[in-house]
Amino acid sequence: DNYLDPNAQLGTQIEMNQAPTGIGWNNIEARRWLVDYYKREQTTDGKNDSRLFYTLWYDGAASDFPEYPNQLIYGSPWNSDWGNRVFIKKYSTDASPLYYWNDNNFRSLRYADMLLLYAEALNELNATPPSKAIECLNRVRNRVNLPNIEDSKYYNGSQISTNKDAFREHLKIERALELAMECVRWVDLKRWGI
């Protein structure tokens, strides 16, 4: 019972809210477009973006990440009844949902968020993206082994790194991927007037 240890860490109900049907309440799900966006670009060693593995559960994840062939959702394999749905893995413990007692702390502020916000501010203050803005973006990308934006094989890196509007549009994508399910998307959309 999760309520027996008086010294347990006090967490949130995030796990129960996002756990798949039959395991939790399933109040929150991700959208398939997010999986597709993560899979657009491969890392420098030809693998899928690791943020996808740590953020979402979906049918096909085992083939997208063969280094983790026996992926479990709270101790259970993927259920074919879930079909093409996408569940949130971030903040989960891969164990039975822990209700309030969970030592996986909710991060309210992240360094990557600050880097991307700083890059966005620098871009808005200049006619073209300054080198410091590009450096901040690349630090976030390089952390997950993605190439510098200028060297991207999927995105038009030369345009993104030299055009203010293209850089802004790409930051919207990077923020969605890096900060998925971290309660910043609504604020981002409001700031961008979307």
Which functions belong to the PLM regions below?
Residues 1-38:
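Polar, glycine-rich mid-to-C-terminal structural blocks
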Residues 1, 42-194:
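Acidic/polar-rich alpha-helix caps and helix-coil junctions
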